[in-house]
Amino acid sequence: MASLLAYGNETEMNADKNNCSELFKGGHEKGIHSVTTIASPHNGSTVSNYVSDAVAPAFLMIQLLHLKCVTGKSHNDLMLDQWGITKDPFTGEKAGFNPLACLKMALSMDHCGYDLTVQGAEKLNKMIKTVKSAYYFSYSACITKDGRNGYTKLNEDYDAFLPFKLSSPLISASVNMFIGGKFIDKSWGANDGIVPLKSALYPFEEDHITYDEAKVIIPGVWYVMPTIYGADHYDFCNAADEKAFGSRQGFFDFYMNLSKLICSV
């Protein structure tokens, strides 16, 4: 979003110059003060490749969402009318049951599941540029520990979200192999349950600095904040796991300190 606001999108501008949205025209960098990512898969997540590359899991997930819209049980507008699987935004007419459209979407590269893959994130990052006047901060978490021979494994001392007890070992095991056309080495093993720690630190090819509170913060550079060990991907939006931040108050203090940091630059 920050990159679009600042630099726009040339393809969109050339497609329809008269009716192009202001978002795609760029020139709004003065309205962006800072960008903060929290447990973000900047460079994709190998676990997403198992869903998107295999097609079948992606198809099933899209199909389930589609069925909720068809039956009227979904309270959310999924805004997938271009695929014909949610209601028409102009008429409000519900979409009919259309598994073929769901399959077509699953086979495409036009969904967030693909963007979260290793190769999808790489393509997306080539389209995104840092805004030179904005401040960038990146927070990450980790629920694994070092094992034998450079591999990682789930740290049982941490209170991980139940589904992550399946996905975390999968990420740790998905190393020393090619995934999404890229060789994934052992450094991709540590994770927060859904995002490899290596991916959460900063976007590859972007300027980055390890945060030091004693030094002046400069814009246009990613500041890599200390990794929070013991917190999983879900803990950043749930104060119930008091172990993750030391206490329930620690959860609120995390966001208060983040707010103070942003306001101080």
What are these regions (language model features)?
Residues 16, 20-265:
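Helical cap/lid subdomain of alpha/beta-hydrolase-fold lipid enzymes
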Residues 1-11:
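Short glycine-enriched nucleophile-adjacent loop
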